[in-house]
């Protein structure tokens, strides 16, 4: 359970990194510099900082590929977990559960797992947490 939560947190972190806005290129920075006719030192420092972001673009590409691999593995793990839970919970064969899971979308599978683990955690909570 702990590993599943950690893996889910990593997937969410990589999703944020992969979907973030790409950094401005050096060519675009030169255009901005010409348009704004930098007179203020703070603006020059800001543009220097943006010029350093080109390295981040390469890193984003690396994390984007890594994110795709992790996401693929996480999806496979979620499919297996959903099948396992259905077999145990509903008392059906593994093939029937696999057919049900295959018919579900990824979003439905995630919601099914969150609902299952949410109920499980709700039952395990300490009694003094009641409000």
UniProtKB/Swiss-Prot annotation:
Tissues in which the protein is found: Expressed by the venom gland.
A GO-annotated cellular component: extracellular region
Q: Where in the cell is it found?
A: Secreted
Grouped into one coarse class, the protein's main location is secreted
Membrane-spanning residues: none
Read off the Pfam families from this record: Latarcin
The processes (GO biological process) annotated in the record are: defense response to bacterium; killing of cells of another organism
Q: Secreted as a keyword? A: yes
Q: Which InterPro entries match?
A: Latarcin_precursor
Molecular function terms from GO: toxin activity
Asked if the keyword DNA repair belongs to this entry, the reply reads no
Q: Where is the signal peptide?
A: 1-20
Which domain of life does this protein belong to?
Eukaryota
Keyword list, A-Z: Antibiotic, Antimicrobial, Cytolysis, Hemolysis, Secreted, Signal, Toxin
Which ranges of residues are annotated as propeptide in this record?
A: 21-60
Which family does the similarity line name?
Belongs to the cationic peptide 06 (cytoinsectotoxin) family.
The record's function comment reads: Insecticidal, cytolytic and antimicrobial peptide. Forms voltage-dependent, ion-permeable channels in membranes. At high concentration causes cell membrane lysis.
Put simply, this protein is called M-zodatoxin-Lt8m
What does the record give as the organism's lineage? Eukaryota, Metazoa, Ecdysozoa, Arthropoda, Chelicerata
What is the primary gene name for this protein? cit 1-13
């Amino acid at each position: 359970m702990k590993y599943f939560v950690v893996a889910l947190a990593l997937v969410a972190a990589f999703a944020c990194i992969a979907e973030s806005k790409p950094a401005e290129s050096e060519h675009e920075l030169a255009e901005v510099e010409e348009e704004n006719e930098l007179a203020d030192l703070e603006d020059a420092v800001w543009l220097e900082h943006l010029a350093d972001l080109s390295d981040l673009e390469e890193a984003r590409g690396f994390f984007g590929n890594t994110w795709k691999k992790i996401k693929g593995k996480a999806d496979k793990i979620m499919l297996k977990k959903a099948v396992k839970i259905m077999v145990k919970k509903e008392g059906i064969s593994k093939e029937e559960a696999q057919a049900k899971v295959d018919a579900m979308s990824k979003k439905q599978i995630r919601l099914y797992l969150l609902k299952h683990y949410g109920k499980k955690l709700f039952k395990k909570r300490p009694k003094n947490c009641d409000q």
